[in-house]
């Protein structure tokens, strides 16, 4: 099924985006990413190692693959920090596709500070960045981010790394209805069925890291996520049947043997 995910000027053949944290080494990160079929991997700017070419670099590990890098501003708590981070990153790498995240609660929930995120988005969009904005599952804030110049909205399903799955499915639907941008469900995905559910709700894609990296068999989970996202997307596009309170016979009664 040819169904490209378009984010700004970029087109991706896979609707699954993966993270790069929590793996034992860069090689395992690469193997799991390739098993997932993802064409986009998000990585904290500090792990891109843009200041010391003599240290191990994740980008070198992925040379020769079709995987693109999505730098993120993990650890930033103000708009100014995120803006500076991405300016330096683009200057060093030429990468303009970014995952903007400004964290409001760094101790317990890792929930985003959406007000600071909007401030950063307004400035970075004017500077030509292609912005995928991590946010809460609030449809009003999603619309504000669209107005601020975001190219994709990334609402959380649940707290980062929690594995709780989609806690507010109606909010994901409301966000999908509120914006005319790709909606990528981000954070809280725990297993393949969570990813499929997100896609069935109408999400344009899913981002997951911990569910793969923390699985007992990361390679198998990566492949499961690949198929789950495809299946969920196909299910959504197919159009599910209406829910009814009573049974509906699937076989006609005409022609039955008369007793």
Curated annotation (Swiss-Prot):
The active site is at 99 (schiff-base intermediate with dxp). Gene3D superfamilies: Aldolase class I (3.20.20.70). SUPFAM superfamilies: ThiG-like. The keyword Transferase applies. Belongs to the ThiG family. It catalyses: [ThiS sulfur-carrier protein]-C-terminal-Gly-aminoethanethioate + 2-iminoacetate + 1-deoxy-D-xylulose 5-phosphate = [ThiS sulfur-carrier protein]-C-terminal Gly-Gly + 2-[(2R,5Z)-2-carboxy-4-methylthiazol-5(2H)-ylidene]ethyl phosphate + 2 H2O + H(+). Pathway: Cofactor biosynthesis; thiamine diphosphate biosynthesis. It is found in: Cytoplasm. 1-deoxy-D-xylulose 5-phosphate binds at residues 161, 187-188, 209-210. Homotetramer. Forms heterodimers with either ThiH or ThiS. Keywords: Cytoplasm, Schiff base, Thiamine biosynthesis, Transferase. It comes from the Bacteria. One of its GO terms (biological process) is thiamine diphosphate biosynthetic process. The lineage of its organism: Bacteria, Pseudomonadati, Campylobacterota, Epsilonproteobacteria, Campylobacterales. It holds the Pfam family ThiG. This is Thiazole synthase. InterPro entries: Aldolase_TIM, Thiazole_synthase_ThiG, ThiG. The keyword Transferase applies. Its EC number is 2.8.1.10. One of its GO terms (molecular function) is thiazole synthase activity. GO terms for cellular component: cytoplasm. Catalyzes the rearrangement of 1-deoxy-D-xylulose 5-phosphate (DXP) to produce the thiazole phosphate moiety of thiamine. Sulfur is provided by the thiocarboxylate moiety of the carrier protein ThiS. In vitro, sulfur can be provided by H(2)S. It is an enzyme of class 2 (transferase).
């Amino acid at each position: 099924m040819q169904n490209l995910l378009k984010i700004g000027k970029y087109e991706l053949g896979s609707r699954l985006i993966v993270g790069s944290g929590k793996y034992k080494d860069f090689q395992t990160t690469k193997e799991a990413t390739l098993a997932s079929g993802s064409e986009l991997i998000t990585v904290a700017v500090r792990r891109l190692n843009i200041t010391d070419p003599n240290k191990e670099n994740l980008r070198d590990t992925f040379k020769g693959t079709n995987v693109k890098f999505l730098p993120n501003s993990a650890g930033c708590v103000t708009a100014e920090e995120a803006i500076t981070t991405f300016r330096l990153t683009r200057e060093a790498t030429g990468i303009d596709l970014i995952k903007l995240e400004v964290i409001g609660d760094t101790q317990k929930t890792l929930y985003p500070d959406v007000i600071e995120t909007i401030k950063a988005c307004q400035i970075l969009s004017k500077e030509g960045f292609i912005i995928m904005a991590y946010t809460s599952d609030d449809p009003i804030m999603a619309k504000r981010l669209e107005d601020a110049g975001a190219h994709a909205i990334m609402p959380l399903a649940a707290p980062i790394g929690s594995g709780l799955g989609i806690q507010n499915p109606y909010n994901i639907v409301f966000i999908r209805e509120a914006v005319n941008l790709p909606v990528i469900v981000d954070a809280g995905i725990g297993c393949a069925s969570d990813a499929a559910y997100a896609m069935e709700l109408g999400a344009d894609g899913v981002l997951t890291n911990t569910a793969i990296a923390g699985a007992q068999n990361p390679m198998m989970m990566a492949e499961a996520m690949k198929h789950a996202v495809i299946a969920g997307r196909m299910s959504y596009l197919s159009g599910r049947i209406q829910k009814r309170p009573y049974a509906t016979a699937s076989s006609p009664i005409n022609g039955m043997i008369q007793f």
